[in-house]
């Protein structure tokens, strides 16, 4: 089926990832995947990091779980890593960092390769997850593609979310979430409580 045959090809084509079918979940658009992340990780007053500004739909999804937000400014080459380090030193129990690294919504900025690597290093040092929301990746018309953060990840710290809504058709409402197998088991339990779509 789609889960077994098509998804590994899709992840390889779009993100350069060698992910098995057991690491990918189909969702009803990227928004459902974002909400599933909130359900999986957040309790009231948990600390998370978002870019400032960021995608409003993500904030609306996370708001349901009443987290404490820490905002990191976005520079011309992506998230301000120095500012993020200050937050992590003050709040080392951050649950995750939510980022839109490719053509960031709403700024349109793409995170540099150096900053992607630095963000991953911090995730390993402070033991938090990176939520890489990347629905705009293939809207690039000039310049070289920057490797996805998930492609750079060797320690299972990245949860990659994407969808067809921006590159094919919003009406499809088809997205996907890629994570390590342990997290996928958790997300499958959550999704089974939300709908019966395989």
How would you name each of these model-derived features?
Residues 1-5:
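Single conserved hydrophobic/aromatic residue that forms the stacking wall/gate
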Residues 6-126, 137-139, 144-155:
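Conserved core of the PLP fold type I
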Residues 94-96, 128-129, 159, 174:
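Short, Asp-centered acidic motifs that coordinate Mg2+ and/or phosphate
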Residues 133:
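Glycine-centered flexible beta-alpha turn that most often forms the glycine-rich phosphate-binding loop
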Residues 154-198:
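Conserved core segment of the aminotransferase class I/II
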């Amino acid at each position: 089926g789609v889960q077994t045959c098509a998804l590994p090809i899709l992840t390889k084509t779009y993100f350069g990832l060698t992910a098995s079918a057991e690491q990918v979940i189909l969702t009803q658009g990227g928004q459902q995947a974002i909400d599933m992340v909130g359900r999986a990780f957040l309790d009231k007053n948990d600390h998370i990091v978002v870019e400032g500004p960021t995608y409003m739909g993500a904030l609306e999804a996370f708001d349901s779980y009443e987290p404490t937000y820490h905002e990191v400014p976005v520079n011309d080459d992506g998230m301000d890593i120095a500012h993020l380090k200050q937050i992590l030193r003050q709040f080392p129990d951050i649950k995750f960092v939510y980022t839109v690294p490719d053509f960031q919504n709403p700024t349109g900025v793409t995170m540099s390769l150096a900053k992607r690597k630095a963000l991953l290093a911090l995730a390993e040092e402070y033991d938090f997850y990176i939520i890489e929301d990347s629905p705009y990746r293939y809207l690039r018309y000039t310049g070289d593609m920057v490797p996805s953060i998930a492609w750079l990840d060797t320690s299972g710290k990245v949860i990659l979310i994407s969808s067809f809504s921006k590159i094919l058709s919003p009406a499809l409402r088809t997205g996907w979430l890629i994570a390590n197998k342990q997290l996928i088991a958790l997300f499958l339990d959550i999704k089974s409580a939300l709908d019966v779509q395989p």
